[in-house]
């Protein structure tokens, strides 16, 4: 059994590498941008080159796990629709077709941004309605996967966090931590709600579903629901950071890229199938604190 982990240098990809090592699962990892260890670079903005590179790296994968993302997220997609489509749709289609030729399973991470945020909490089969290009592209790839594969796992997730001090694309709490450590103020959207998801929970749940052959579409997020401002305050209290530096933004700026402000994903479906615990907000923050303390010893 060999897992091909695409984007193994990112937060989610690194966690897959860690857990594969712990379970003695053979894996091959690729990177898209920053160098890390012996990971091989694959250009996912060049789908033709990508397919050839994957063939050379891992000709017989058991499963392909796609953790690749672009720095800048939603804003980057709106400003760079061409590269965004290549990464989030065209490369995914190539990978799906390649997986089918190899009889390999495929794991794809999607987003709460496939919804409009008007009627939470959302179940997997609720009507979608993305408000921005990022969500549209994620949904388009979801549809292609579901129409062209049998052995797939689509995990919709959101607000993924974990300790990754070296990343050039920090998650929300890492960005908050770095900003306050520099003595700067941090503007926090109190109008933006979601499910904070510790990366370890996300990856453990995905691996468990894959191991049990529970294919399909799932919501995999933390069991808590909170706005970004209160989440930031909770983190600061635990980390001993200056809470006065957190500036509460109660209204979205007029030029913000449209997005769902009330994004609550229902996890009843996945909870019935896995033993992995999806921790709530406070438990997830305690996990993060343990990681931080371990890294600075």
Give residue ranges: language-model regions.
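Conserved Rossmann-fold NAD(P)-dependent oxidoreductase catalytic core, especially the SDR/UDP-sugar
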Residues: 93-131
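Glycine-rich Rossmann NAD(P)(H)-binding loop
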Residues: 187-193, 218-226, 273
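NAD(P)-cofactor binding segment of oxidoreductase domains
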Residues: 76-107, 139
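Amphipathic terminal alpha-helices
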Residues: 281-297
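NAD(P)-dependent short-chain dehydrogenase/reductase
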Residues: 143-194, 201
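N-terminal Rossmann NAD(P)H-binding glycine-rich loop of SDR-like oxidoreductase domains
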Residues: 1-23
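Mid/C-terminal beta-alpha module of Rossmann-like enzyme folds, strongest
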Residues: 203-205, 212-255, 261, 296-297
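NAD(P)H-binding glycine-rich loop region in Rossmannoid oxidoreductase-like domains
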Residues: 44-87
């Amino acid at each position: 059994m060999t897992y091909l982990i695409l984007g193994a240098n990112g937060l989610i990809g690194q966690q897959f590498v860690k857990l594969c090592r712990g379970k003695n699962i053979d894996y091959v990892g690729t990177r898209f941008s920053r160098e890390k260890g012996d990971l091989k670079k694959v250009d996912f903005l060049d789908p033709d080159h990508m397919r050839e590179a994957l063939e050379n790296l891992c000709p017989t994968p058991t499963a392909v796990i796609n953790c690749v993302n672009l720095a800048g997220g939603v804003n980057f997609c709106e400003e760079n629709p061409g590269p965004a489509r290549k990464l989030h749709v065209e490369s995914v289609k190539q990978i799906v077709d390649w997986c089918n030729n190899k009889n390999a399973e495929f794991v794809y991470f999607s987003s709460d941004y496939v919804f409009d945020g008007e009627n939470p909490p959302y179940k997997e089969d609720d009507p979608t309605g993305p408000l921005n290009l990022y969500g549209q592209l994620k949904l388009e790839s979801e549809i292609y996967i579901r129409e062209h594969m049998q052995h797939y796992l689509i995990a919709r997730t959101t607000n993924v966090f974990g300790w990754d001090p070296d990343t050039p694309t920090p998650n929300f709490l890492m960005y908050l931590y770095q900003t306050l450590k520099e003595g700067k103020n941090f503007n926090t959207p109190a109008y933006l709600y979601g499910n904070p998801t510790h990366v370890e929970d996300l990856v453990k749940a995905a691996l468990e579903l894959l191991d049990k052959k529970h294919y399909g579409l799932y919501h995999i997020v933390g069991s808590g629901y909170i706005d970004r401002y209160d989440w930031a305050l909770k983190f600061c209290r635990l980390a001993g950071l200056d809470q006065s530096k957190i500036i509460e933004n109660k209204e979205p700026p007029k030029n913000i890229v449209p997005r769902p402000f009330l994004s609550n994903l229902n996890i009843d479906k996945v909870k019935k199938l896995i033993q992995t615990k999806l921790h709530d907000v406070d438990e997830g923050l305690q996990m993060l604190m343990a990681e931080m303390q371990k890294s600075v010893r």
